[in-house]
Amino acid sequence: KTAAISRHTNAFKINEDVVIPLPRMAEYTDGIERINIELSLRNKLALCEALTDFFSQSTLPLGRHDDAAGISSAERLEDRVAQALALIDGVRTLWSGWLRDVEPLFAQLQDHSLRASWKTQIRQPLQQIFSGVAFEPVLKECNAIHQRVLKGRVWVALHMHAGDGNVHTNIPVNSDDYEMLQAAHGA
């Protein structure tokens, strides 16, 4: 049966069944939530690294533009790339600080009063920096980078079956992603 499933997917889960005394359940779930917050922040920091690598390339993809202004692609990109790199560096610094100080910030990270958000902290500002048809390929690649990095995100899932008293702790992973497997092992 496993061989038949593996022909159709490269995904599987690392599974652990744990008996948690009911009075300790909240402590256990908070511990798992902290692990998930740390894993999420690490994934978002990997996104910052991937975006920095992209914007550090010597050439970036550009779409159609009006050459009548006489401004070269390099001139049009130079300032925008510097703004993008500064934005990403600032967000990376913020998120790194949250990861470093996860213990005292746990309550705010858990209730989302502190929220590491690709959409609001990176994507929206990049859309402002790279506005216009000529820069659509740049934004398209940023979204593709986000999807690739997000695909490797590791998290820990919990569920219980009625009556067995076990907490089933699962870490879904893709078997073709070595870094994801290592992150799951570390979690």
Each predicted region: which residue ranges?
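Noncatalytic alpha-helical scaffold of FAD-dependent oxidoreductases
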Residues: 1-187
